[in-house]
Amino acid sequence: MSDDGGGRKNLRMPEDDEVFAEVTDMLGANRVQVRCADGEERTARIPGRMQKRIWIREDDIVLVEPWDWQDDKADVTWRYEKSDADQLREEGHIE
């Protein structure tokens, strides 16, 4: 979120219920298919506050919050830029 001058950023990390995920397919109707870091494939919903403000594409790294009552669905809570995703890979947070 803030740049420390060394090319590194303090990135938003997953909170209690969130997991890293990679977008694998665009489904339409504000939904995407994601492969989560916990090994699950989920259908994720893009909430209204993100629509038309934050564009999500295939292969983007996002944070999702799985639903409590239906484990194969989730909500997208954050999208990382490409440089941020590269930093997460370098630091070992994602593969």
From Swiss-Prot:
Q: Which UniProt keywords apply?
A: Initiation factor, Protein biosynthesis
Q: A single GO BP annotation from the record?
A: translational initiation
Keyword Plastid set for record: no
- Which GO-annotated molecular functions does the record name? RNA binding; translation initiation factor activity
Q: Which InterPro entries match?
A: NA-bd_OB-fold (IPR012340), RNA-binding_domain_S1_IF1 (IPR006196), TIF_eIF-1A (IPR001253), TIF_eIF-1A_CS (IPR018104)
On the tree of life, the source organism's domain of life is: Archaea
> Locate the S1-like domain: which residues?
7-81
Q: Which GO terms describe its cellular component?
A: cytoplasm
**Pfam families from the xrefs?**
eIF-1a
Q: What does this protein do?
A: Seems to be required for maximal rate of protein biosynthesis. Enhances ribosome dissociation into subunits and stabilizes the binding of the initiator Met-tRNA(I) to 40 S ribosomal subunits.
Show the PANTHER family listed in the entry.
Answer: EIF-1A (PTHR21668)
Please report which protein family the annotation says this sequence is part of.
Belongs to the eIF-1A family.
Protein name stated in the entry: Translation initiation factor 1A 1
Species of origin: Halobacterium salinarum (strain ATCC 700922 / JCM 11081 / NRC-1) (Halobacterium halobium)
